[in-house]
From Swiss-Prot:
<feature type="domain" description="HTH myb-type 1">
    <location>
        <begin position="1"/>
        <end position="56"/>
    </location>
</feature>
<protein>
    <recommendedName>
        <fullName>Transcription factor MYB77</fullName>
    </recommendedName>
</protein>
<keyword id="KW-0677">Repeat</keyword>
<dbReference type="GO" id="GO:0006355">
    <property type="term" value="P:regulation of DNA-templated transcription"/>
</dbReference>
<keyword id="KW-0539">Nucleus</keyword>
<feature type="region of interest" description="Disordered">
    <location>
        <begin position="145"/>
        <end position="167"/>
    </location>
</feature>
<feature type="domain" description="HTH myb-type 2">
    <location>
        <begin position="58"/>
        <end position="107"/>
    </location>
</feature>
<dbReference type="InterPro" id="IPR017930">
    <property type="entry name" value="Myb_dom"/>
</dbReference>
<dbReference type="GO" id="GO:0048527">
    <property type="term" value="P:lateral root development"/>
</dbReference>
<dbReference type="GO" id="GO:0003700">
    <property type="term" value="F:DNA-binding transcription factor activity"/>
</dbReference>
<comment type="function">
    <text>Transcription factor involved in auxin response. Functions in auxin signal transduction and modulates lateral root growth. Interacts with ARF response factors to promote auxin-responsive gene expression. In response to auxin, binds sequence-specific motifs in the promoter of the auxin-responsive gene IAA19, and activates IAA19 transcription. The IAA19 transcription activation by MYB77 is enhanced by direct interaction between MYB77 and PYL8.</text>
</comment>
<dbReference type="GO" id="GO:0010929">
    <property type="term" value="P:positive regulation of auxin mediated signaling pathway"/>
</dbReference>
<dbReference type="InterPro" id="IPR001005">
    <property type="entry name" value="SANT/Myb"/>
</dbReference>
<dbReference type="InterPro" id="IPR009057">
    <property type="entry name" value="Homeodomain-like_sf"/>
</dbReference>
<comment type="subunit">
    <text>Interacts with ARF1, ARF7 and IAA19. Interacts with PYL8.</text>
</comment>
<feature type="compositionally biased region" description="Low complexity">
    <location>
        <begin position="195"/>
        <end position="224"/>
    </location>
</feature>
<keyword id="KW-0804">Transcription</keyword>
Length: 301
């Protein structure tokens, strides 16, 4: 098999192709290609149909033909055989070559110009929007404060409404203004002072001697509350439960409770601080206790 020849056809090849077409007709391209070394049947067919056939129009395409090709291509796409049937004497290959070499460039050029124009306009719009947004984002905000240009550390701040002119003799004066933050100080509620009368038990008890001054009553009440917390709370409960009708029985119980608490307290005081009792009588024995109230005083060393 001879090597395939690529490139333009020579005059000798064209003459040989015409003779073979007259001999075999414009159909048997395989037999025709055997008489032309290096050319395939397809190459012979294209050369004949596009260039050498007497039916092919070699005149330039008219503007009417160009308009027909452009309209048909917009409708049919790249179906060149279908488009060529709309033109007398034009082959599909001729129409395709004319489109690729001339019409496509013209149409794409016009479209390209329009597209570029629109694209430039579209590109300008975002740029304008970006520039506006950039300017607005970084525009100086009037905060009502004025920074001193002559301050070494730039900390001096003053009200912009009182900015002195550079030529003013008071241009060196700056009034620092505090900047209020986003914090709200909630005042603490004042403690509610409860009267001692609402917390005192219905029955007032005291360890002081009869005839003692009333000035030490509040102090004694506080000491009693500290010394006998269990007794005080339990006494309140008993008063509420028993009522006024059984007051006599309740007082007996209260006296027994007081004796027990005093004994416990005195025993603890003797162990810790070495205190002693003055003004009271103590009964010894299994049922011993304090018959009368006395004053507890610390031992003086």
């Amino acid at each position: 098999m001879a090597d395939r020849v690529k490139g333009p056809w020579s005059q000798e090849e064209d003459e040989q192709l015409r003779r073979m077409v007259e001999k075999y007709g414009p159909r048997n391209w395989s037999a025709i290609s055997k008489s032309i070394p290096g050319r395939s049947g397809k190459s012979c067919r294209l050369r004949w149909c596009n260039q050498l056939s007497p039916e092919v129009e070699h005149r330039p395409f008219s503007p009417e033909e160009d308009e027909t090709i452009v309209t048909a291509r917009a409708q049919f796409g790249n179906k060149w055989a279908t488009i060529a049937r709309l033109l007398n004497g034009r082959t599909d290959n001729a129409v395709k070559n004319h489109w690729n070499s001339t019409l496509k460039r013209k149409c794409s050029g016009g479209v390209a110009v329009t597209t570029v124009t629109e694209t430039e306009e579209d590109q300008d719009r975002p740029k304008k929007r970006r520039s506006v947004s950039f300017d607005s984002a970084f525009a100086p905000v009037d905060t009502g404060l004025y920074m001193s240009p002559e301050s070494p550390n730039g900390i001096d701040v003053s009200d912009s409404s009182t900015i002195p002119s550079p030529s003013s003799p008071v241009a060196q004066l700056f009034k620092p203004m505090p900047i209020s933050g986003g914090f709200t100080v909630v005042p603490q509620p004042l403690p509610v002072e409860m009267s001692s009368s609402s917390e005192d038990p219905p029955t007032s008890l005291s360890l002081s001697l009869p005839g003692a001054e009333n000035t030490s009553s509040s102090h004694n009440n506080n000491n009693n509350a500290l010394m006998f917390p269990r007794f005080e709370s339990q006494m309140k409960i008993n008063v509420e439960e028993r009522g006024e009708g059984r007051r006599g029985e309740f007082m007996t119980v209260v006296q027994e409770m007081i004796k027990a608490e005093v004994r416990s307290y005195m025993a603890e005081m003797q162990k810790t601080s070495g205190g002693f009792v003055v003004g009271g009588l103590y009964e010894s024995g299994g049922n011993g206790g304090f018959r009368d109230c006395g004053v507890i005083t610390p031992k003086v060393e």
